[in-house]
Amino acid sequence: MKNILKYIIPVCIIFTLSGYVNAQDEISPERKKAIDSLALEKVRDLSKYISIIGDKATDQAEASRVMDRAEELFVEEAEIGVSSLNREQVNYYKVRQYLMRLNQLNYDKVMIKWYNIHYISDLERQPDGKYVGVITVYQRFEGISDDGLTYKDTTKKDITIYVEKKKTQIRGRIIEFWDVLLGDIRVTETTS
């Protein structure tokens, strides 16, 4: 009996502590509201960065600086989808490659506007402790060349959102916080 108790008690303690740790990683409704707000803010920031990078009036040094800022919003291996009314296939590029291609488009004037930005799926906890959600945006693209040719489309895009608990040290104290990063941006629909 003593041998059984010797094993059962530590197992019970481990399960109790793991439940406590798990509870620490749950997101309260108030915290979720703040995280949702931060995620939407990061998507709006990306929208501004894309407009600046695509704008032909932006000098290359500024475009490069903004590309760096935009890249910081994403998880490491994220990809962004590119579609066209002229083809059915959607091409996917790593974030930096997408931003560089955007900056080098063969139009004399480029206007990109994101609108109707909203969550389509609530944050769901994953087995690794991260939370994942999806935000949808609509992107209006217009490219105009000097000879008067214009290309316009509207693309519906789904952006994967990752939320994870991180730690940082401030004045010798370890501080935990929830961070939001953007994942893949998938094209779901392209119309004229």
Predicted regions and their residues:
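Bacterial Sec-dependent N-terminal signal peptides
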Residues: M1-P29
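Residues at beta-strand starts and edge strands
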Residues: I9, G129-G133, D153-K157
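Short, low-complexity N-terminal intrinsically disordered segments enriched in polar/charged residues
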Residues: N22-D68
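N-terminal targeting segments with Sec-dependent signals, encompassing both cleavable signal peptides
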Residues: Q24-R44, S84, K113-P127, R173, ...
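Short solvent-exposed beta->alpha transition segments
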Residues: A63-M111
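Surface-exposed, charged secondary-structure patches
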Residues: R96-D147
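Glycine-rich, aromatic-bearing surface loops/beta-hairpins
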Residues: F141-S192
